[in-house]
């Protein structure tokens, strides 16, 4: 990947760390939103590599940051904010989603792992999709299905995290 890469996260950033190590390349810019200390535990490998934006960044703030790069590839890794329509239309943005929304549209939105577990689904998976104005509505570019029957919630999170990392590596290499 020769393009500038900007990665966003709201949680720990562990997915970005794993993807970067497997690719042998770090994003050109890693962004997270300000959150109260008790809600935040950033992966130690990201210390000093992260730029902070407001907890609920504005369209102007996001546009100013992304506008520093010509045609950046923007990836969302547990970014718990909705990108404004103008940003979705101006930049090429992709989101990793830990719910097999190709088969289970009810897994769109927040906490798809918990939803899959609570629904007692036999299968789930992960997708990478283009970010559009609608939440988890964009074109799906990668997906992988896995059996989750009988898994504990912690196992489910772990398996879907591993699948997501694998999908991102494949997507970003190609």
Name each model feature, range by range.
Residues 1-174:
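One-carbon transfer enzymes
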